[in-house]
Structures are given as structure tokens and as C-alpha cells.
């Protein structure tokens, strides 16, 4: 039985966000590096650095905690992450069937033949792939 590094990454970010932690440390693989780069580009993460500890590499990410102000006061927005395609049930979509998360407000991350990219990039390039996760 193998490890699901994508699920570990999403769970670490979700747990740190719920506990209001500033940083998250996850094991660095090619897939996790590409997903974290997308999260950084889309504004869900403030910064990322690579850290080496006894011949193993880790990604240390600083989370972005957004605060919204309403008439009733200030509240903190949460980042929702959901794993879609998993090792036991792979989910694929062609470019016409790529789902829009919250009507375009969120993003879907896909693994395509041209690398890991967001749903918008995959639609522009007219390629489909495996739907890895939703983030909103």
C-alpha cells in the first residue's frame, strides 16, 4: 500500500488553517512542489521555501490568513481543500468536462500530459486530465 502525498499535503494545509498555524511543513516531491507553486500563484499561500533535513527535503509554506470585515465584526475566512481523484478511484475529465468550482471562484488542480495545472489553464490549452483536488 502506497502513500498518498497529495492527500497528506491537503490535510496538512487544512489542519494548519483550522488551528491558525502560520507555517506548514510537508515532504517535497515533484507533485507536491507543483501543487504548492499553483497555490502560491493563486494566492492561497504567501511564501514557500525548500528545507533540507538529514538527506530529506521539505517544503515550508507560510499560509495566508484572510480577514473579512462586516457590520458584525471581523471574521477569518477559511480555505477549503478537497481531494477528488484518489488512488482507489481515479477521476478523469476532458477539457469540456472540467468542472468549475463555485462557478469559477475556486480552482481545480489537474494532472495533464503537460504537467500539473489549474482548470483555467487546462481549458485554455484545450487538454483534459486527472482531477486532483478542488480549492475554494
Curated annotation (Swiss-Prot):
The keyword Plastid applies. GO terms for cellular component: chloroplast; ribonucleoprotein complex; ribosome. Pfam families: Ribosomal_S8. One of its GO terms (biological process) is translation. InterPro entries: Ribosomal_uS8, Ribosomal_uS8_CS, Ribosomal_uS8_sf. Disulfide bonds: none annotated. It is found in: Plastid, Chloroplast. The keyword Cell inner membrane does not apply. PROSITE patterns: RIBOSOMAL_S8. One of its GO terms (molecular function) is rRNA binding. Keywords: Chloroplast, Plastid, Ribonucleoprotein, Ribosomal protein, RNA-binding, rRNA-binding. Belongs to the universal ribosomal protein uS8 family. PANTHER family: 40S RIBOSOMAL PROTEIN S15A. HAMAP family: Ribosomal_uS8_B. One of the primary rRNA binding proteins, it binds directly to 16S rRNA central domain where it helps coordinate assembly of the platform of the 30S subunit. Part of the 30S ribosomal subunit. NCBIfam families: PRK00136.1. This is Small ribosomal subunit protein uS8c.
Amino acid at each position: 500500500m502506497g502513500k498518498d502525498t497529495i492527500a497528506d499535503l491537503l490535510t496538512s494545509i487544512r489542519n494548519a488553517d483550522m488551528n491558525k498555524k502560520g507555517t506548514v511543513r510537508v515532504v517535497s516531491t515533484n507533485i507536491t512542489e507543483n501543487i504548492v507553486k499553483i497555490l502560491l500563484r493563486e494566492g492561497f499561500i504567501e511564501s514557500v521555501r525548500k528545507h533540507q533535513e538529514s538527506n530529506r527535503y521539505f517544503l515550508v509554506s507560510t499560509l495566508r490568513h484572510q480577514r473579512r470585515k462586516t457590520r458584525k465584526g471581523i471574521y477569518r475566512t477559511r480555505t477549503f481543500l478537497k481531494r477528488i481523484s484518489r488512488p482507489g478511484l481515479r477521476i478523469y475529465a476532458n477539457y469540456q468536462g472540467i468542472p468549475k468550482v463555485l462557478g469559477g471562484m475556486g480552482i481545480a488542480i489537474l494532472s495533464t500530459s503537460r504537467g500539473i495545472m489549474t482548470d483555467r489553464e487546462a481549458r485554455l490549452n484545450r487538454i483534459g486530465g486527472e482531477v486532483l483536488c478542488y480549492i475554494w
